């Protein structure tokens, strides 16, 4: 292999090209646009509409069990230390895969048949990346072609730079921006418009840019907001750039400025002293209508909003804007005055449905709160009524909750939205049920997904129990032919508690934590682990809970609700659902994942037959849909009788939910699966990793191909 170092200013670009791999047949860029119809996977979500759907059906329910590992690619050497949270979904264009990996967020091009490295690229951004709010390898790359041989791979670095590379060899597209780079920190602000520092300013993104026609659209994200030092954080924004030149085309402010619609929903001019409210997940686009759909996150901070009275538009809203101008067309706010971290965490799904004989161009948004919100994507009108209903009110000093919240009437919730004491408490045995009820006396248990956080105390009430997380960042999938959405959901409830922060830590009155417990700063996944980041000191362990109580909820406010080491609620703990959008009805729902080992082998359950429980963490694994099956991997490692310890990649019949196949993986799924075809052979690729297993891409195919292991630097 040959190596070239390109000096491009402050960051250093490294491109490694496998010369032997540059074969004309593999890298020829023929006229025509990539499409799943041609066996490609040209977008993170397969298409611009977010469906994660491919019409390929060589691999199906009758042969899924026969899949073998065709090749594998370890990402250990794409950075100075291995990555254990590989979340990428590769793109497949004419037999070449493009994706990110490693702690330096390197871009790699791989031969789709063998996994052999064609080229790699990375930027060495130093401190700027080391302190970035969204670290590790991100979710992948984007692709653009003019159909005439100008083919580009586009990604956002850890340090928030937009970079374009020539798809053929990984070299920088020097005509884009400045020598191939647009500095996305330029234009980001906090306060009333103060520019952030280009090195230390807090902003980034780990999702892929939306690329449509000659426009590339990029969102923004800040550090996770459970225990942050200030509410006056960097403000979220969405921007569109000319894909050829890098010229800024438009900006949409997710926290409206004075004179912009929605500014008055930040009472007491609180727009000027609050931040976040970015679009950190995938953006979807209707190219024909010229409309862009922006799923907006929570403002600073996640669980306390006393410093931002009002409904806080466009926080936790779906916003539709014009592709050419960025002008708002319509919006719908899912949560008024957000306090539950119910940010819109995944791509809106664009489907053409038929309701009562009426054709509707729809947008469907799965959510953390287990509702699919469905709208006419042209007008923003809900397809079925969404009702404003009274919700519990906060008793936290300084907090002012919205008196009502939107409740969709259809489709029904596809996951557990709160803990119902009358039917949800663990009941494997009468003894465990009684212990569960006793433990819950230490919590405020509401019958609403909108039970607000409360001040928690180790010696009193530990927290308020509400919804956990249904669908998270990997997002759901949809079949554009049958109009069915396939949505995953975690089913464990969450406890949320607040505490005054230690002196000097934050200007926010209350942050996540418990009075009487050692304060712990909450770090997001991967925070501290960028290529050049120094290791953070280990936080002190929390003290044990009071005798007889359930364990203390973590500082982030989620989980921790157990009895004798078992979840405090009845199974299933993770589910996969099919939702018919023509009818607004649940077609089927099944547990996802084998029963965890700690439940299957628990001494208090000895001799009992435990039905398949599904797995916690299902909200954090993605899925894909093909002509006949839904494919999704396990979020946990298990070792049931009859197979070695590991996780399974599973296929479900689309019509019934019956599992029709499963293949073994050495680690849990950590990204989202995709599929493509090369020379008439279909492959499925999924990212795996976690725990002690570093990130790896696994490629599966039917028998007939060889198995090969590649790793950059090996």
Which residue ranges define each predicted feature?
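Bacterial N-terminal signal peptides that target proteins for export
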Residues: 1-15
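Bacterial N-terminal signal peptides
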Residues: 11-25
């Amino acid at each position: 292999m040959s190596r070239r170092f390109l000096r491009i200013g402050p960051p250093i670009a490294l491109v490694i090209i496998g010369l032997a791999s540059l074969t004309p047949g593999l890298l020829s860029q023929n006229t025509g646009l990539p499409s799943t119809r041609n066996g490609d996977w040209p977008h993170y979500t397969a298409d611009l509409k977010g469906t994660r759907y491919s019409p390929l059906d060589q691999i199906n329910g009758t042969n899924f069990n026969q899949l073998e590992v065709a090749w594998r690619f370890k990402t250990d050497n794409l950075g100075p230390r291995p990555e254990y949270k590989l979340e990428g979904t590769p793109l497949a264009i004419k037999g070449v895969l493009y994706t990110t990996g490693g702690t330096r967020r390197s871009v790699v091009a791989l031969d789709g048949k063998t996994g052999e490295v064609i080229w790699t690229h990375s930027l060495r951004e130093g401190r700027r990346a080391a302190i970035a709010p969204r670290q590790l390898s991100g979710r992948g790359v984007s692709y653009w072609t003019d159909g005439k041989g100008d083919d580009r791979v586009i990604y956002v670095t850890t340090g928030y730079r937009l970079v374009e590379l020539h798809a053929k060899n990984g070299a920088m597209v020097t005509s884009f921006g400045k020598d191939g780079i647009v500095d996305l920190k330029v234009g980001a602000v906090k306060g009333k418009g103060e520019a952030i520092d280009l090195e230390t300013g807090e902003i980034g993104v780990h999702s892929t840019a939306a690329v449509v026609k000659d426009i590339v659209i990029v969102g923004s994200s800040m550090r996770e907001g459970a225990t942050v030092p200030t509410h006056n954080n960097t403000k979220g924004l969405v921007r569109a750039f000319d894909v050829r030149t890098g010229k800024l085309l438009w900006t949409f402010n997710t926290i409206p400025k004075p004179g912009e619609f929605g500014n008055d929903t930040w009472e007491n001019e609180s727009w000027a002293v609050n931040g976040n409210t970015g679009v950190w997940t995938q953006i979807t686009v209707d190219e024909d209508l010229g409309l862009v759909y922006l799923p907006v996150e929570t403002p600073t901070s996640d669980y306390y909003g006393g410093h931002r009275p009002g409904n806080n538009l466009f926080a936790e809203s779906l916003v539709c804007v014009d592709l050419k101008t960025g002008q708002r067309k319509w919006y719908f706010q899912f949560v008024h005055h957000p306090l539950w971290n119910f940010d819109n965490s995944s791509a809106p799904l664009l489907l053409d449905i038929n309701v009562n004989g009426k054709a509707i161009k729809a947008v469907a948004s799965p959510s953390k709160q287990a509702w699919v919100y469905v709208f006419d994507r042209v007008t923003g009108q809900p397809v079925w009524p969404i009702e404003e209903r009274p919700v519990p009110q906060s008793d936290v000093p300084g907090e002012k909750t919205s008196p009502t919240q939107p409740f969709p009437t259809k489709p029904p919730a596809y996951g557990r939205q709160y803990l119902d004491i009358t039917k949800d408490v663990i009941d494997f045995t009468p003894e465990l049920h009684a212990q569960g009820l006793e433990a819950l006396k230490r919590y405020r248990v509401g019958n609403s997904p909108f039970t607000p956080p409360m001040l928690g105390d180790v010696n009193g009430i530990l927290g308020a129990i509400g919804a956990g997380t249904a669908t998270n960042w990997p997002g759901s999938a949809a079949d554009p032919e049958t109009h069915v959405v396939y949505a995953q959901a975690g089913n464990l409830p969450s406890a949320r508690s607040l505490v005054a922060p230690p002196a000097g830590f934050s200007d926010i009155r209350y942050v996540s934590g418990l009075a009487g417990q050692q304060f712990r700063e909450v770090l997001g996944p991967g925070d501290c682990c960028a290529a050049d980041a120094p290791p953070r000191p280990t936080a002190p362990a929390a003290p044990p809970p009071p005798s007889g109580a359930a364990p203390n909820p973590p500082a982030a406010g989620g989980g921790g609700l157990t009895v004798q080491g078992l979840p405090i609620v009845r199974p299933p703990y993770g589910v996969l659902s099919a939702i018919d959008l023509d009818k607004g009805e649940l077609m089927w729902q099944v547990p996802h994942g084998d029963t965890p080992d700690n439940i299957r082998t628990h001494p208090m359950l000895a001799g009992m037959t435990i039905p398949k429980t599904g797995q916690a963490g299902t909200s954090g694994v993605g899925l894909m849909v093909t002509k006949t099956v839904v494919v999704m991997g396990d979020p946990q490692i298990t070792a049931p009788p009859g197979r070695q310890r590991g996780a399974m990649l599973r296929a479900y019949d689309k019509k019934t939910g019956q599992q029709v196949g499963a293949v073994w993986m050495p680690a849990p799924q950590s990204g989202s699966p995709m599929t493509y075809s090369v020379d008439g052979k279909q492959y499925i690729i999924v990212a795996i990793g976690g725990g002690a297993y570093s990130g790896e891409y696994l490629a599966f195919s039917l028998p007939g191909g060889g198995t090969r292991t590649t790793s950059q630097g090996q």
